[in-house]
């Protein structure tokens, strides 16, 4: 029956933005429509709640949210891959910003206090402030609920400063030619970490222990399909953008 088929579907949740970019070819593959049920959320909290309640089997999450989920489920999830490295950028049309010290006295708009973008900005900001003699507290951080809000704000006011993931950074710059990439946060992270330091892991894929225990073959098949979909996204960016 239709109901029993829906119960057999592997329920996959992801966030709008870079964590979903590697999934888009899977989402649009009709041959997989009877295997996966995809949902996209605007905020990580929605995915956490769905994983805790058992409404999702697999979720693509910010790395820090995955650690929160691990604790909430008392260790009943596993990380099965890293789906996003970096992809965060500081964007502005303010020509006076050429260094971290130039952010003093300005407001930076970003999403989610205590989420991955927050950590990715604050860590190098503190390190650069200590190294270059300015106070990190002089940089005001203002949090918005979604990256689309920041992209819209920047396109209307290019002198503002925002932290955006792809593809939102590119979308904002296409809407206002004054905007530019001020910092690639992956490069800034690497500068602070130094040679041999940790890489900027921003997104991971987690799966419930119950799915691993009851259907390990399905997990392996998902990993293969996800890898193929992500490779297509990288090799055919124009086609991926159209999806």
Where are these regions (language model features)?
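Short, glycine-/small- and polar/acidic-enriched structural segments
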Residues: 2-143, 160-161, 166, 177, ...
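Short acidic active-site motifs
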Residues: 46-47, 148-150
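Alpha-helix capping and helix-coil boundary motifs
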Residues: 99-102, 146, 235-238
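Pocket-lining segment of extracytoplasmic ligand-binding domains
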Residues: 64-65, 149-242
